[in-house]
Amino acid sequence: MKLLPLLFVILIVCAILPDEASCDQSELERKEENFKDESREIVKRSCKKECSGSRRTKKCMQKCNREHGHGR
């Protein structure tokens, strides 16, 4: 009978704490999002270079982004 409260506490703690798989999944999602953000930034910088000077128009930037797969 003395073990019953201890088992109950362990059960509650296990239910509250996230399991290892969900932690790994969250970390993977964060890494994937960071990769997407970095990729967008790289494309944005290269398009700014490509569309620099007098060619730097909204149309040029949109075309460049579409060609690199980041068009909206």
UniProtKB/Swiss-Prot annotation:
Domain notes per entry: Has the structural arrangement of two alpha-helices stabilized by disulfide bonds (CSalpha/alpha 2(S-S)).
Effect of S46A: Slight increase in inhibitory potency towards Kv1.1/KCNA1
One function term, GO molecular function aspect: potassium channel regulator activity
Keyword Disulfide bond: yes
Site (Important residue for potassium channel Kv1.1/KCNA1 inhibition): K48, K49, G53, R55, R56, K63
Protein name from the UniProt record: Potassium channel toxin kappa-KTx 5.1
Function: Weak blocker of potassium channels Kv1.1/KCNA1 (IC(50)=578.5 nM-9.9 uM) and Kv1.6/KCNA6 (~60% block at 30 uM of toxin). Acts by binding to the pore and occluding it. Has a voltage-dependent mode of action, which can be explained by a high content of basic residues causing repulsions at higher membrane voltages. Shows a weak interaction with muscle-type nicotinic acetylcholine receptors (nAChR), since it inhibits alpha-bungarotoxin binding to muscle-type nAChR from T.californica (IC(50)=1.4 uM). This suggests it probably weakly inhibits muscle nAChR.
Disulphide-bridged cysteine pairs: C47-C64, C51-C60
Keywords: Acetylcholine receptor inhibiting toxin, Amidation, Cleavage on pair of basic residues, Disulfide bond, Ion channel impairing toxin, Neurotoxin, Postsynaptic neurotoxin, Potassium channel impairing toxin, Secreted, Signal, Toxin, Voltage-gated potassium channel impairing toxin
Effect of K63A: Moderate decrease in inhibitory potency towards Kv1.1/KCNA1
Main location: secreted
Similarity comment text for this entry: Belongs to the short scorpion toxin superfamily. Potassium channel inhibitor kappa-KTx family. Kappa-KTx 5 subfamily.
Annotated site location: Key residue for potassium channel Kv1.1/KCNA1 inhibition: K58, K59
Propeptide position ranges: 24-43
Result, substituting K48A: Moderate decrease in inhibitory potency towards Kv1.1/KCNA1
Residues modified as Histidine amide: H70
Effect of K59A: Important decrease in inhibitory potency towards Kv1.1/KCNA1
Outcome after substituting K49A: Moderate decrease in inhibitory potency towards Kv1.1/KCNA1
